Amino acid sequence: MESLNKDSKIYVAGHRGLVGSAIWRNLEKRGYTNLVGKSHAELDLLDPVAVRQFFDREQPEAVILAAAHVGGIMANLVNRADFIYQNLQIQQNVIGEAWRHGVKKLVFLGSTCIYPKNAPQPIREDALLTSPLEYTNEPYAIAKIAGLKMCESLNLQYGTDYIAVMPTNLYGPGDNFHLEHSHVLPGMLRKMHLAKMLNRGDMDGVRADLRRLPVEGCDADRMSDAEIATLLAKYGITAEALHLWGSGKPLREFLWSEDMADATVHVMLNVGFDQLKGDSTEVRNCHINIGTGKELTIAQLAEMVKETVGFEGRIEWNAEKPDGTMRKLCDVSKIHSLGWHHTVELADGVKMLYDWYLNAERPASR
């Protein structure tokens, strides 16, 4: 495993996203001074010619691939071709050009959706490809599996040192708080905040929130209090209660994005493929789960968010709505054995996320 110097050129693909921006900050904090990042307008990762020209020009020594085409349940279900095509293309272009340009080290970020729908819990890395995937995000998952297999195969055939990491559910600064398509934790936090404002009769606070991040393109300053209340009620947000989907019984694991960034950089600097491939003649499952190894129910999460936000109304569950997978927990023994552990517990992370949300000039909408 070749070492990197503080002035080694490191390309962070997706440096403006939730994880990519955290990785950038982590590298800066560690004293790395030669970081390269390009916005989508500056570099279209779907364009093979543009990506090759970028690598010709920049010649990075290391690459962190945190860029991906992502979305929620409905987007994955409806836009299946986009999710497999765009992610395969991004991976083919970036990982392929990294190899062709002799990049020393690459870390590829995947997702725990690569694992079978009914994988034994906690999910070990060797559960990969043992049974069918969840149908909803199957195209996205197959693209991510192809990415990790591309890294693994390049290592075996050409001696590269490209490592794939699979994060659990992430949350943190710069998260997506859009009511229409946010993930569970940031969406729940914003809903709870708006319910608190309604509960207190603070319509100025509600309007301030909707100005920063409009819902369905609304103009809060031109809407009456009743019109705003009707709009928010569509999302289960009322003064008396916050109505959430499902039974609240599913178990989930959450990882602070800054912890994920630290794990990614730790792997880049301290973990080599030789440590992962083992002694078997059939080398597989060299990827690494990144998570906390801790879980809680969605109902427990809702109570935690309620206490943090200070909402004094009720939480009501609509059991007629789907729960999704009932349990999804990573086995994190491999990353622990490689010297990394998470540092931010969920209760602290929720408080930090709410503080960020209240003080951010404009929460990310992505």
Which residue ranges define each predicted feature?
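Active-site segment of SDR-like NAD(P)-dependent oxidoreductases
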Residues: 70-71, 112-120, 168-171
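SDR active-site strand-loop-helix element
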Residues: 13, 38, 63-67, 106-112, ...
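NAD(P)H-binding glycine-rich loop region in Rossmannoid oxidoreductase-like domains
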Residues: 37, 48-88, 97-100, 117
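Short-chain dehydrogenase/reductase
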Residues: 84, 88, 136-148, 178-186, ...
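Conserved Rossmann-fold NAD(P)-dependent oxidoreductase catalytic core, especially the SDR/UDP-sugar
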Residues: 92-138, 163, 176
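C-terminal substrate-binding subdomain of Rossmann-fold SDR/epimerase-dehydratase oxidoreductases
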Residues: 3, 14-18, 22-30, 194-366
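Hydrophobic positions on the long internal alpha-helix
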Residues: 90, 94-98, 150-151, 263, ...
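Active-site Tyr-X1-5-Lys
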Residues: 135-168, 184-200
